[in-house]
Amino acid sequence: MNAAFIAALLILGALTLDAMAYSFTCERIPCTNNSDCHGSDLCQCRPPRGDGFSYFCSEY
């Protein structure tokens, strides 16, 4: 019983880490062009979505 509980906690922890953002320096930083975004090469200035009106850095 204890081994199954420990295995479940390890699996839950691994799933939680996979669900976290890839880069904390890129997420939701206001920008005007790609040079304002820091971090990996995937971090780019993206157009607003939905009702938003300003550009933000994002890796997605």
From Swiss-Prot:
Tissue expression as described in the entry: Expressed in salivary glands.
Post-translational note: Contains 3 disulfide bonds.
Main location class: secreted
Molecular functions per Gene Ontology: toxin activity
Intracellular or extracellular location(s): Secreted
Coiled coil: none
Listed GO CC annotations: extracellular region
Signal sequence coordinates: 1-21
Keywords: Disulfide bond, Hemostasis impairing toxin, Platelet aggregation inhibiting toxin, Secreted, Signal, Toxin
Segments carrying motif Cell attachment site: 49-51
Its job: Tick salivary platelet aggregation inhibitor that plays an important part in the anti-hemostatic strategy of ticks. Inhibits platelet aggregation induced by ADP, thrombin and thromboxane A2 (TXA2). Blocks platelet adhesion to soluble collagen (most probably through the binding to alpha-2/beta-1 integrin (ITGA2/ITGB1)) and binds to purified glycoprotein IIb/IIIa (ITGA2B/ITGB3) in a dose-dependent manner. In vivo, reduces thrombus weight effectively in a rat arteriovenous shunt model and inhibits thrombosis in a carrageenan-induced mouse tail thrombosis model.
Protein family membership: Belongs to the ixodegrin family.
Protein name, UniProt field: Ixodegrin-like peptide
